[in-house]
């Protein structure tokens, strides 16, 4: 319907333009202006056939059809001469009353017409609605929450307790500024929240406003700069004027890197000067208001490294707070928050879900429970069970199941052997990521998956950890070669080889884990004109060759080790593959049970230590120790 309406509007506009063009072009007479002397000469030579006099202008037509225009001076006898020579002379009727108004209107009509088209296009670009909106270029597009203040509080923010403590003094200042002013202190003018996408930067800003019970003014960094020059700076001024009217309040600028990118001599991308003007105005405004005005600026970004240093100096964004991804305890608390409005069955173990989601942010966890709720609703269930949560987790981490994909029995066997090789390495090595389940059901881009879950969150890795990870990655390829020979290896190990090589390269060139190369790191720089591609600098060809040799040595050693392990456990591995082909998905416990039939014990390889139980035990031990100390004191 809207498309048809727009078609008719444009058809009318184009039609009106054609009519106006024909109207004005039709009224024009194409004549050549000449001097009075030339006309007199033509009259005397008898070359003029017709003349039309319009006030002080005469249109002369020669016998050869040429039209000439001449301006007649007062009291001229040119008309009498033309009559004497037999020229037909006509005098146009005098202009009717109001004719000059018509002429003025007709002369201005094209200009008014195109102004109307321009206004129409501006209204279309601004989304219609208010007629004046198209001209409010300099007005800020910030959303102001005054009566409807953010309902989010610190109860809705979990997993970042240290960050919450850090921002509580901002809330106290907004509630009672006199308390700080008595001691001569001032709160930070600006707070920069930075971290990976989804960690809760925007949610935390809303919670601060909700706890302080003050107006919340929200704007995106991309709302400042548009197609018109000077609009960004004007919108920054209007934003702070709006904030002063509603003080005390919080200004929240999301994705500030869109406008706060570091200034430089080399413009990268278009609109460079306009963006710098907007940034300069933002710097001036943040210097121009005093903390006694009751305005706190909170900004969020995923890229603090590209922000202008002038924006980050004390006096503007005094406090910079990093919001990390939640650890296992934080994920558990976040899951509890998002589970408040969900109907969970009794079998749902949020502690297990927290342990099974390393690297997940708050947004990821919310999406996980939402996906589980949708799956439960699709199945017609009244509650969300652990089955739906695990299925949702598999969909997010590994992709959708492609059960309808046709795979030949021979290919299926190779996939099963490949995945069994991965699982075997994970079980016999000292890798901290324990095997959870093995599946040969195609998911996403993968034809099979071996899922591993970490026992605990790790922040640093030693050389042994990295060797074990490379061993697990090469386990699938090693199993293929042992079972089918060198000519039977497949393309299924492409991603495994890439990840293993990248890990080995980092060990040698970044983390100094090679005895031959030594504890050095290759300096690398990114070129902004090549899409951020990094290149090594100040590195000799000999050193690069040594690095390549060490990477190859690490990969080769771990690959040979993986093949030896597969050879050692070849018979029980065949039985595992057979079971995997029958069931398509098996758990770690089922894998271990098959090995037990061959007299091989993989003790505690599937046991996942309960971090939460460890935490509880440590808390109990602390309480016991404190009670013992009290008794000793008494």
UniProtKB/Swiss-Prot annotation:
Database matches in Pfam families: AAA, AAA_lid_3, FtsH_ext, Peptidase_M41
Role of this protein: Acts as a processive, ATP-dependent zinc metallopeptidase for both cytoplasmic and membrane proteins. Plays a role in the quality control of integral membrane proteins.
Region entry Disordered, spans: 615-634
Active site: 419
Superkingdom of source: Bacteria
PANTHER family, alphabetized: ATP-DEPENDENT ZINC METALLOPROTEASE YME1L1, METALLOPROTEASE M41 FTSH
HAMAP family in the record: FtsH (MF_01458)
A GO MF label: zinc ion binding
Record-listed ATP binding positions: 195-202
Spans within the Cytoplasmic topological domain: 1-5, 122-634
Family: In the central section; belongs to the AAA ATPase family.
Gene designation: ftsH
Name of the protein: ATP-dependent zinc metalloprotease FtsH
Binding site for Zn(2+): 418, 422, 496
Compartments in which it is found: Cell inner membrane
Cofactor(s) in the UniProt record: Zn(2+)
Periplasmic side: 27-100
Keyword Protease: yes
Organism per entry: Aquifex aeolicus (strain VF5)
TM region positions: 6-26, 101-121
């Amino acid at each position: 319907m809207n498309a048809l309406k727009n078609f008719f509007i444009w058809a009318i506009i184009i039609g009106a333009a054609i009519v106006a063009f024909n109207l004005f072009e039709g009224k024009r007479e194409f004549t050549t202006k000449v001097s009075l002397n030339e006309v007199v000469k033509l009259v005397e030579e008898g070359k003029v056939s017709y003349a039309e006099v319009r006030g002080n202008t005469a249109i002369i037509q020669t016998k050869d059809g040429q039209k000439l225009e001449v301006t007649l001076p007062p009291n001229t006898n040119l008309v009498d001469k033309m009559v004497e020579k037999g020229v037909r002379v006509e005098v146009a009727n005098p202009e009717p009353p109001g004719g000059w108004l018509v002429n003025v209107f007709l002369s201005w009509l094209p200009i008014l017409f195109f102004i109307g088209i321009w206004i129409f296009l501006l209204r279309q670009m601004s989304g219609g609605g208010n007629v004046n909106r198209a001209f409010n270029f300099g007005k800020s597009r910030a959303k102001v929450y005054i009566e409807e203040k953010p309902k989010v509080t610190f109860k809705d923010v979990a997993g970042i307790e240290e960050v919450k403590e850090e921002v509580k003094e901002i809330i106290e200042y907004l509630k009672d500024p006199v308390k700080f002013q008595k001691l001569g202190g001032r709160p930070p003018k600006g707070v920069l929240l930075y971290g990976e996408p989804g960690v809760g930067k925007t949610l935390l800003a809303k919670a601060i406003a909700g706890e302080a019970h003050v107006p919340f003014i929200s704007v995106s960094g991309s709302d400042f700069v548009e197609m018109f020059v000077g609009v960004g700076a004007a919108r920054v001024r209007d934003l702070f004027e709006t904030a002063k009217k509603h003080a005390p309040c919080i200004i929240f600028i999301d994705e500030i890197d869109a406008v706060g990118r570091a200034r430089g001599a080399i413009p990268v991308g278009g609109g460079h000067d306009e963006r710098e003007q907007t940034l300069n105005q933002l710097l001036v405004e943040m210097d121009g208001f005093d903390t006694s005005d009751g305005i706190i600026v909170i900004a969020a970004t995923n890229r603090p490294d590209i922000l202008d240093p002038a924006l980050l100096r004390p006096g503007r964004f005094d406090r910079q707070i990093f919001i990390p991804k939640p650890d296992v305890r934080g994920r558990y608390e976040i899951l509890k928050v998002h589970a408040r409005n969900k109907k969970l069955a009794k079998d749902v173990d949020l502690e297990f879900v927290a342990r099974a989601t390393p690297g997940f942010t708050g947004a990821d966890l919310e999406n996980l429970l939402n996906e589980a709720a949708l799956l439960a609703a699709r199945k017609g269930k009244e509650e969300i069970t652990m089955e739906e949560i695990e299925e949702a987790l598999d969909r997010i981490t590994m992709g959708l199941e492609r059960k309808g994909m046709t795979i030949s029995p021979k290919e299926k066997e190779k996939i099963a052997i490949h995945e069994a090789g991965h699982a075997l390495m994970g079980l016999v090595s000292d890798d901290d990521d324990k095997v959870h389940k093995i599946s040969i059901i195609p998911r996403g881009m993968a034809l099979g998956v071996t899922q591993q879950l970490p026992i605990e969150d790790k922040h640093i890795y030693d050389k042994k950890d990295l060797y074990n990870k490379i061993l697990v990655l090469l386990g699938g390829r090693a199993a293929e070669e042992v079972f089918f020979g060198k000519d039977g290896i497949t393309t299924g190990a492409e991603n495994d080889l890439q990840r293993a090589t990248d890990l080995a390269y980092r060990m040698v060139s970044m983390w100094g884990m090679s005895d031959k190369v030594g504890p050095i790191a290759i300096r690398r720089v990114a070129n902004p004109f090549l899409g951020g591609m990094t290149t090594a600098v100040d590195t000799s060809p000999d050193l690069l060759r040594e690095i390549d040799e060490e990477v190859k040595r690490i990969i080769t050693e771990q690959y040979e080790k993986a093949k030896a392990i597969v050879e050692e456990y070849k018979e029980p591995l065949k039985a595992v593959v057979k079971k995997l082909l029958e069931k398509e998905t098996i758990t770690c416990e089922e894998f271990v049970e098959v090995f037990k039939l061959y007299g091989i014990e993989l003790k505690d390889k599937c046991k996942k230590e309960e971090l939460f139980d460890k935490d509880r035990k440590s808390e109990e031990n602390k309480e016991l120790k404190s009670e013992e100390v009290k008794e000793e004191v008494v």
